[in-house]
Amino acid sequence: MTEENKEVLFRRAVPSEKAALQKLQIDVFSGEQGIPPEKVPVLPSLAPQYWCAVKGSVPIGAVAAWREEGKIHWGRFAVKKEYRGQHIGQELALYSLRDLFSQQVDTVYLGARDATVKLMEKWGGKVIGASSFFHGSAITPVILQRDDFWRAQG
């Protein structure tokens, strides 16, 4: 953890935090990227699991994982604008992926924007298809396998 993040707690979210985390995700994805708010939350029927970065009692970052069509997806990765550039997103991603892979998950799928693609490639992720455009920005399909992830961690 970096010196600037010592007051930030990274953890698995509790159910009572879901609404606040979804609001954060909607603010980022809808407010900044123009994605319709109704398309942002993961459907409850997919039983999403959430992780968060909190400062005090305020959520400043969120990410989710869910099972869809037999595959584990990781996404809705968001950090409040004023906390970007402090490695909070990177630490949240690492925390959530370590936790997810410790749950006997072998493979994670995601559709990612360029910055997240670079992060996932650094951790053993592989691009598995061509980018497509979603609400004006490129989304690239990426796969991250547990063994590759742990190997990249050293």
Question: Each predicted region: which residue ranges?
Answer:
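Conserved acetyl-CoA-binding loop-helix of GNAT-fold acetyltransferases
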Residues: 79, 85-98
